[in-house]
Amino acid sequence: MELQEVLHMNGGEGDTSYAKNSSYNLFLIRVKPVLEQCIQELLRANLPNINKCFKVGDLGCASGPNTFSTVRDIVQSIDKVGQEKKNELERPTIQIFLNDLFQNDFNSVFKLLPSFYRNLEKENGRKIGSCLIGAMPGSFYSRLFPEESMHFLHSCYCLHWLSQVPSGLVTELGISANKGCIYSSKASGPPIKKAYLDQFTKDFTTFLRIHSEELISRGRMLLTFICKEDEFDHPNSMDLLEMSINDLVIEGHLEEEKLDSFNVPIYAPSTEEVKRIVEEEGSFEILYLETFYAPYDAGFSIDDDYQGRSHSPVSCDEHARAAHVASVVRSIYEPILASHFGEAILPDLSHRIAKNAAKVLRSGKGFYDSVIISLAKKPEKADM
């Protein structure tokens, strides 16, 4: 089976679907002010045709309610500028393209569109024809839009996914060079870490080059993804998954060879690696870069404070929180896990993930490192 056929979130609307388990993104409120600033600066710059039709691409939109949370924030940011100008006629038509791989559950996405349009008219006074939303399926590591056609490109929690498993993870004798590991983790040797970094460098460079061609001069990109600000200071979702698969091997429920042949195309870069690649590729200026922490169990309760490390790591809801974390992890990785190990293993694996998540939450290290980076396409010399 081709890798792209399983590199998607779990579809549908069941208990293990991404739609039911993606609410944690709603609590990453650090992104919204930067998003608003990007869009408002774009509109005030009076770039070509932007006040007639503002064109947006959401790269790696996945499925579920949070797809439209981002869209709503974009629309509200655009309309906020119109309100400041006190001229409703200056509100541009908005055209938004939702992008993900062909296997993404776009059916679930567009089932939510009628209610989104109703809420948009109620909250923003926008008729359906003033905000046009469509799909643009395909890999965001390839061309998606015509040259110099887009004003703003956005991607949230996608760019840590690589286009392929790095080469060099198997020796000439066919033995795994990353035994006991499923990605570039703490136990991986330097050659493995270099292989993953090399693949990320290649992919991120391609991403920047291709999408710089699609953006108009001085167009913007806002990217948020997993990083490793503190080297292995606290385990991320991949570490939870790796620990849990190893538990199944130790307990005799899974063959060691199955684990050793499982390599996930994910890499969490450092901010220095991100900055270096952007500067070396050369198409963009870095306007803003910030790292922050998102807790494992964000989305478990709307009453929690998820702005940082402020909440207590121990809770009377510990087991429920850990089960929530396991459901989120399963909703993200189930297609690739089922493809390699088979579906029968998933319930036992989820149980181990919950047990390991409880331990990490109890230790106070249940956080993901994330980076937000705002980029502006450098103008051509003739435009300066």
Curated annotation (Swiss-Prot):
What's the top EC group for this one? transferase
Q: Which residues bind theobromine?
A: 157, 160-161, 237, 368
Please list the tissues where expression of this protein has been recorded.
Highly expressed in developing endosperm. Detected in young leaves and flower buds. Present in immature fruits (grains), but barely in mature fruits.
GO molecular function list: caffeine synthase activity; metal ion binding
Q: Which UniProt keywords apply?
A: Alkaloid metabolism, Magnesium, Metal-binding, Methyltransferase, S-adenosyl-L-methionine, Transferase
- Which Pfam family, any one of them, does this sequence belong to? Methyltransf_7
Binding-site positions, S-adenosyl-L-homocysteine: 18, 61, 66, 100-101, 139-140, 156, 158
Q: Which reactions are catalysed by this chain?
A: 7-methylxanthine + S-adenosyl-L-methionine = theobromine + S-adenosyl-L-homocysteine + H(+); theobromine + S-adenosyl-L-methionine = caffeine + S-adenosyl-L-homocysteine + H(+); 1,7-dimethylxanthine + S-adenosyl-L-methionine = caffeine + S-adenosyl-L-homocysteine + H(+)
Q: Does this entry carry the keyword Magnesium? A: yes
Q: Which pathway does it serve?
A: Alkaloid biosynthesis
The record's cofactor note says:
Binds 1 Mg(2+) ion per subunit.
Q: InterPro entries under this entry?
A: MeTrfase_7 (IPR005299), MeTrfase_capping (IPR042086), SAM-dependent_MTases_sf (IPR029063)
Gene3D superfamilies, per database record:
Methyltransferase, alpha-helical capping domain, Vaccinia Virus protein VP39
Residues under site feature: Involved in substrate discrimination: 154, 266, 328, 343
* Family that this chain belongs to: Belongs to the methyltransferase superfamily. Type-7 methyltransferase family.
Q: What is this protein called?
A: 3,7-dimethylxanthine N-methyltransferase 2
Please name the source species.
Answer: Coffea arabica
Read off the lineage from the record.
Answer: Eukaryota, Viridiplantae, Streptophyta, Embryophyta, Tracheophyta
